[in-house]
Amino acid sequence: MSGPLEPPRRSALEFFDRQFERQVEARDYGLNPFERAVLPHLSGDVLDLGCGLGNLALEAAGRGCRVTALDSSSTAIADLARRAGARGIALEAHSADLRHYVPARDYDCVVSIGLLMFFACGDARRLLARMREAVRPGGLTAVNVLIEGTTYLDMFDPEACCLFGHDELSEAFSGWEVALSRHEDFPAPSGTLKRFHTLLARNPARP
């Protein structure tokens, strides 16, 4: 971590804290479709940025990955640490504001599912670039974002959100080996729409 981190934006954090509290109460710990797509590709040292309740982090660590899981929600991180301890699974889980986060080292896999769209576009794109830099030669990045065409915006802080361009992730990892590139639409409340792009790309440089 690069140093003292600024307080996170409140509205998105409060939105997800409430959601996480409901999920914990309901014991709703299933992997979402994006996490299920990513999990088989993870190995070695894994950095999970915006891990939420840590369902992916916990499953990856249970399969032998060495996982560092970070999220802005102390509610989510506390529950992840509790569940990992109960299952005897070793992982690192920390609460942090990720807008200006700089990875302290490199990793075999760097994951960000459903995080970057909650930052102003400048912050989101800079973090995406730092994620790319943190992937070891031959390593993998797995990124999932909302893209243009999304009409469900209730969870966003209006001053800090970013809908990525349709192919912006692909362009950001131009020259990398694409393991998966998937555009998907999901219905949302009141007839709105969530439009996602999920990209798994491997650093072509070899160790």
Protein language model annotation of sequence segments:
Residues 125-137:
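A short glycine-rich, Lys/Arg-flanked "PGG" loop and its adjoining helix->strand segment in the class I
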Residues 102-110:
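A short acidic, Gly/Pro-enriched loop at the edge of an enzyme's catalytic core
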Residues 1-43, 52-102, 119-126, 140-207:
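Class I (Rossmann-like) S-adenosyl-L-methionine-dependent methyltransferase catalytic domain
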Residues 49:
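Conserved beta-strand/loop positions that form the S-adenosyl-L-methionine
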Residues 109-123:
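A short SAM/SAH-binding and catalytic strip from SAM-dependent methyltransferases
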